């Protein structure tokens, strides 16, 4: 029944197998794609119009060398250097091993918050520690009365059955339970970090490795809050939301973009001595930075390759921003659409290198400073102010029907005349404006009853100014992308 339901998103194929007796060759596959998200009536109409399989306009498909039957990859893609590679013997990629996946907490609602205080994370840690003491005592009692089942596996099973699973007190995961079975107490001394959880939506993070399921390599990208860096984030393989890239100056969440992979400008490493660290920081004098060295993440192999083509003045920072410009190029993402879904991005060598670097830097500066306030009148936007109250009540809403030129910010403020083209800047399947409207809403987690209020992040006009700013960023991003020079692979 669901095959013909309106707008069904489940991929369905009707297969007709024809057996020909005495055939002297292998079989063929003929294919016809009728389109996506059709209504029930449209699907039935197509079948009715064709009447017979003989009337269908079939396309014979032959697998590529990559084994692709449909959505075949571009064979030119493999001629380019990959952005990164975890294989130590593959040193010809742009970043080699110097990249990370986005941070994955497995308990976002407990660790991430718009509020500056991490009261929920601390409350969970305190509950964890109390549970550990209680279970340890029960285990000791068990050992005194039982002579079998006293090993580590028995203890793990015992703790599994005994621990509290109250969803409003704790969020268990495999990693946290492993700490529990090892009887590791967790202290509440942690640093607060900024994380971009979704496009253009920052949250406060209680940065404690024991309660972050997959912290990845972020300590080598941002060792502490006073260490600066910028990081290009790209969609991981398998995305059905289209390929995207975004840049931040903070930690990135695993779902900032789909299964995010993150490529920093710098990599930090612990120094052998304070003297060597100071020399390696190009005379940086920030706080405790003397205990770390900083180097560019782009490899020497790639630098040598680019200098051989574009000249000796090219540096690793130029290459970093060149990469960001290429990843924003519509021609690149369209030419290698299927490759970007299935493989790590590979970056071509293009003509007009200096222009790509210039626009890559401009795009990065725009996206890194997306919170900078903008005058709504300069964008031709009308703001109807019935009361100067900038609190988001529940959530923002678009106009009636499909009208996105209007946003009801709250009961007292309405924003009108939002340019239609502002919605054409798409990040991870949605416009940047839609991400703001969706993410900056008051939410209550059903399992934990934790309330997350975006008004607590910066207060005042922050969310209002952010919304206006993102409209401007969306328009300027498209202007800069339109300035990209001719896409010509060398």
Spell out what each predicted region is.
Residues 1-490:
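Sequence-level detector for compositionally biased, low-complexity segments
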């Amino acid at each position: 029944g669901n095959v013909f339901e309106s707008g069904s998103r489940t991929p369905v194929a009707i297969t007709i197998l024809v057996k020909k007796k005495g055939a002297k060759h292998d079989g063929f596959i003929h294919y016809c794609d009728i389109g996506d998200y059709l209504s029930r009536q449209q699907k039935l109409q197509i079948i009715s119009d064709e009447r017979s399989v003989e009337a269908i306009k079939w396309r014979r498909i032959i697998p590529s060398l990559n084994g692709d039957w449909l959505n075949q990859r571009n064979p030119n893609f493999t001629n380019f250097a990959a952005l990164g590679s975890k294989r130590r013997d593959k040193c010809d990629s742009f970043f080699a091993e110097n990249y990370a996946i986005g941070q994955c907490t497995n308990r976002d609602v407990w660790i991430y918050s718009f509020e500056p205080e991490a009261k929920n994370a601390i409350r969970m840690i305190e509950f964890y520690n109390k549970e550990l003491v209680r279970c340890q005592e029960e285990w000791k009692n068990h050992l005194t009365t039982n002579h079998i089942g006293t090993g580590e596996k028995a203890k793990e099973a015992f703790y599994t059955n005994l621990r509290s699973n109250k969803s409003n007190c704790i969020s268990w995961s495999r990693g946290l339970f492993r700490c529990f079975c090892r009887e590791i107490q967790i202290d509440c001394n942690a640093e607060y970090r900024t994380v971009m959880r979704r496009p253009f939506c920052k949250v406060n993070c209680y940065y404690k490795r024991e309660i972050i399921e997959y912290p990845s390599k972020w300590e080598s990208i941002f060792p502490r809050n006073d260490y600066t860096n910028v990081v290009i984030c790209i969609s991981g393989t398998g995305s059905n939301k289209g390929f995207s890239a975004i840049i931040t100056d903070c930690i990135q969440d695993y779902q900032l973009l789909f299964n995010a992979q993150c490529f920093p400008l710098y990599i930090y490493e612990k120094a052998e001595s304070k003297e060597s660290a100071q020399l390696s920081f190009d005379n940086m004098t920030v706080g405790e930075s003397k205990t770390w060295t900083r180097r560019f993440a782009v490899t020497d192999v790639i630098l040598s390759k680019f200098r051989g083509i574009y000249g000796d003045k090219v540096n690793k920072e130029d290459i970093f921003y060149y990469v960001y410009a290429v990843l924003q190029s519509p021609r690149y993402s369209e030419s290698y659409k299927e490759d970007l879904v299935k493989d790590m991005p590979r970056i071509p060598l293009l003509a007009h290198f200096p222009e790509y670097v210039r626009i890559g830097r401009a795009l990065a500066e725009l996206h890194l400073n997306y919170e900078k306030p903008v005058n709504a009148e300069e964008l031709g936007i009308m703001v109807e102010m019935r009361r100067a109250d900038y609190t988001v009540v529940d959530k923002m809403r678009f106009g009636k029907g499909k009208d996105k030129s209007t946003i009801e910010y709250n009961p007292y403020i309405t924003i009108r005349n939002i340019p239609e083209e502002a919605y054409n800047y798409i990040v991870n399947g949605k416009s940047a404006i839609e991400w703001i409207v969706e993410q900056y809403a008051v939410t209550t987690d059903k399992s934990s009853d934790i309330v997350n209020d975006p008004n607590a992040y910066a207060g005042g006009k922050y969310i209002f100014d952010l919304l206006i700013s993102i409209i401007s960023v969306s328009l300027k991003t498209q202007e800069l992308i339109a300035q990209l020079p001719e896409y010509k692979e060398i």
